[in-house]
C-alpha cells in the first residue's frame, strides 16, 4: 500500500510539471551594493557543471527545488540518514522531479562513515523504494570508500554562500571565476539552507549566460 501511494505521488507530481509553469522564485533584484559582473572569457572550454546539495541544513530546500524547476535543471541531493525521514515529502518531490539522491556521511574514520552510509542506504530503500551508491564523504576517506563501490562526490568548487551579508550577484561572480579555472568538469557544492536558496536563481542565470552546461548527475557519470 505504501509503495502504491508513493508511486501515485510521483506520477501525479510528474504530470503536474507538464502543465504551464508557474513562477517559482523571483531572482533577487540587484542593489547598489552588488558588485558588477566581471567580464569572463566567452570560451568556457565546454566545462560540464554538476550541482550537489548537502542536506544537513534543509531550511531552504523547497525554494532550492523551486529554482531548479523554474530553470529546468537537475542536481544531486545528499541526505544524512535521519534527514531522509525528516524530509520525506520533499524526498518524494526530488525523486519525482528527476533529481538524484545520495547519502551524506561524515564519520571520524572510514569504517564509521561506512556504517552511516549503510544505515542511510537502508533508510532510503525503506521509505523511497530506491537504492543509491552516491555519497558525500570526507576527502580523506573517499578513495577507500570508492574501492568498496561507493560513487563519491569530488567537490571542486565550494559554492556555499558565506552568509546573508553576501549578495547573490557577488556570490555568483565568485563562483563563475572559480569554475573558469576548472577543466572538463566542475563539481559545485551548495547546501539546502536559506542563503543557498537566495543565491541559486542568480547563479543559474549566470551559468546559463556563460554557456556552462549543467549535466545530470548519475551514478554512472560523476
Where are these regions (language model features)?
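Gram-positive cell-envelope targeting signals
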Residues: 1-3
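Charge-rich, solvent-exposed alpha-helical interaction surfaces
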Residues: 5, 9-12
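Active-site beta->alpha N-cap acidic-glycine motif
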Residues: 13-119, 123, 222
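Structural recognition of the beta-strand scaffold that forms the well-ordered cores
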Residues: 50-52, 75-79, 100-105, 132-137, ...
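Catalytic grooves of carbohydrate-active enzymes
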Residues: 59-61, 171-220
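Sec-exported extracytoplasmic/periplasmic mature domains
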Residues: 69-73, 95-99, 122-129, 150, ...
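Alpha-helical scaffold elements lining the catalytic groove of polysaccharide deacetylases
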Residues: 107-128, 141-184, 196-202
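Short, polar loop motifs at secondary-structure junctions
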Residues: 138-142, 220
